[in-house]
Amino acid sequence: MRFAWTALLGSLQLCALVRCAPPAASHRQPPREQAAAPGAWRQKIQWENNGQVFSLLSLGSQYQPQRRRDPGATAPGAANATAPQMRTPILLLRNNRTAAARVRTAGPSAAAAGRPRPAARHWFQAGYSTSGAHDAGTSRADNQTAPGEVPTLSNLRPPNRVEVDGMVGDDPYNPYKYTDDNPYYNYYDTYERPRPGSRYRPGYGTGYFQYGLPDLVPDPYYIQASTYVQKMAMYNLRCAAEENCLASSAYRXDVRDYDHRVLLRFPQRVKNQGTSDFLPSRPRYSWEWHSCHQHYHSMDEFSHYDLLDASTQRRVAEGHKASFCLEDTSCDYGYHRRFACTAHTQGLSPGCYDTYNADIDCQWIDITDVKPGNYILKVSVNPSYLVPESDYSNNVVRCEIRYTGHHAYASGCTISPY
């Protein structure tokens, strides 16, 4: 009985090994091709989809942008015949049913069609060789870059593009940035409430994703071109009176709504020509809401206006502090607006202007009590130096004003260090 079981098991094992095994070709994948000779197609990747087997064949894929033809490549002579031959990169995606027949015919023809190209840096190198002799056993080494040769993207990037390792679309000198429709720009709250021991400085967040400092410069020609005198009734100056934009005589008890004030109006345009955003000196949670003008004031004193006597340099009109809503009104070509007059995005980007026309509230000096004569209009931006700048010597504009009692003429507006 024991002999019978042994004989039965032996026959089953022999059947499993010899007779009962199905043809190996029915379950085995198509054999891989042997190592290709130099210049032939090589199988890189093989996969199956919907019952069909696909192969990725290549002589060595690489990307080469269009460049000038090398004059020595087509020059006749023995030297050209012995020059290193670079195989032309071709990348094919074919069905494996017809790939076997085409590989045998396409290999020699593609190798013969290879043309020498000038040596250059390449973005992607796979199976690339600068020599005509290529060992079949080094197909894996072809996919690696030599230690001394570092692939670069220099021939793919737009010219003069600046690398940015900060927040998305943040480089002010990058004309290819996209910030208009980018919801993640300035995603981090740089105006969070400072914690004890924090190293925040005035202008919260300027050192977080920017390099350098801002530099505000007022436009003297903009002021000189649009300075004029206007008379307005007190009932039209209620919001201005609320923000202390008038002389002290306007707040007397005997002043009526139909009394007029004489205003020296002028515009202002401030440019940030630095390398960092000019951000408000106050954190966002302390911004003040002004119901008359329906916006937040993020700085107590962004500008200061004074009227000085031309001979004595004494103040003849009561200047006032102008606290504005900072925003990018316009920008130079290649720059984009990134700040607006809202509750959380106030500031001034590099290469952009914050413009205040002469017809808006508080863009004036109340000269109701000033006599006709020659004066100096002094306009200062960031007068208290609350926000760090790279240069404070260009923050003041001085203009010569000739006031006749009904008209004012501005001339000689220049940047001044004081």
Curated annotation (Swiss-Prot):
Annotated binding of Cu cation, by residue: H293, H295, H297
EC supergroup of this enzyme: oxidoreductase
Lysyl-oxidase like, as annotated region: 214-418
Cross-link (Lysine tyrosylquinone (Lys-Tyr)): K321-Y356
InterPro entries found in the cross-reference section: LOX-like_protein, Lysyl_oxidase, Lysyl_oxidase_CS
Any one GO cellular component localisation term in the record: extracellular space
Post-translational events: The lysine tyrosylquinone cross-link (LTQ) is generated by condensation of the epsilon-amino group of a lysine with a topaquinone produced by oxidation of tyrosine.
Disulfide bonds: C239-C245, C292-C341, C325-C331, C352-C362, C399-C413
Protein name in UniProt: Protein-lysine 6-oxidase
